[in-house]
């Protein structure tokens, strides 16, 4: 099932022995991608973009990955959304109106500069939504030249000119979950009935998951975003009112 993903990775491995992988720690696409990349590259730097640093429920995934893939490096950088939160004082975070705004492209270039690695891998899939489908399908044509100067098709997964690749481009969530199960990898984190969506501090399912499983992580989030506590309080009040009826 994943021969196409392996073919994409193999194409890039002919160009470089080192890659940057944007890695969410607990998400299914990141878990599967690291397993697929590890046999093909000498150096892999996993870049984790955080909203709140040092959350234990995320760190268990980092420890698992380091144990299974001992040569992998991890680098933590602020999520691009965090800069916007700070600029506007979102959910009570300490506000700085002069905070410079960063995009994913800005962070990518900074990480390239810090690591000396050019090629970047992300877990984007066409099935994620219309914008990603349009972007990835545009890579079906020639997207640049390889290191030998030959024109190369992107196979809807490789941007040769910008040196970015997306091995999971044509797969669905169910395919990725099957790969994880079949290869004995750590299951991705789930909040309620949904898959992990990272550190979504406005998601009641995420906050309740932490409340019952990692209460110290919840307090860390509240210490940075004090107004996030209101989301949880409102939900509890709603449940209390329903019980009274």
Regions found by a protein language model. Give the residues of each.
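Nucleotide-activated chemistry modules centered on ATP-dependent adenylation/adenylyltransferase
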Residues: 1-245
């Amino acid at each position: 099932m994943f021969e196409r993903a392996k073919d994409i990775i193999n194409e890039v491995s002919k160009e470089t022995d080192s890659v940057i992988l944007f890695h969410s720690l607990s998400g299914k696409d990141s878990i599967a991608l690291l397993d697929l990349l590890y046999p093909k590259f000498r150096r892999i730097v996993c870049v984790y973009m955080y909203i709140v640093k040092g959350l234990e429920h995320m760190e268990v995934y980092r420890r698992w990955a380091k144990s299974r893939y001992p040569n992998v490096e991890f680098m933590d950088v602020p999520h691009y959304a965090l800069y916007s939160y700070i600029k506007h004082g979102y959910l009570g975070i300490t506000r700085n109106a002069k905070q410079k705004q960063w995009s994913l492209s800005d962070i990518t270039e900074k990480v390239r500069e810090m690591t000396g690695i050019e090629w970047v891998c992300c877990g984007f899939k066409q099935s994620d939504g219309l914008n990603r489908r349009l972007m990835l399908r545009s890579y079906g044509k020639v997207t640049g030249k390889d290191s030998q100067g030959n024109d190369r098709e992107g196979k809807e997964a490789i941007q040769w000119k910008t040196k970015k690749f997306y091995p999971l481009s044509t797969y669905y969530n169910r395919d990725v979950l099957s790969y994880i199960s079949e290869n004995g990898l750590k299951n991705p984190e789930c909040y309620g009935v949904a898959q992990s969506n990272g550190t979504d501090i406005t998601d009641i399912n995420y906050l309740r998951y932490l409340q019952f499983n990692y209460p110290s992580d919840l307090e860390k989030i509240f210490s940075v975003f004090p107004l996030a506590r209101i989301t949880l309080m409102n939900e509890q009040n709603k449940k209390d009112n329903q019980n009274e009826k």
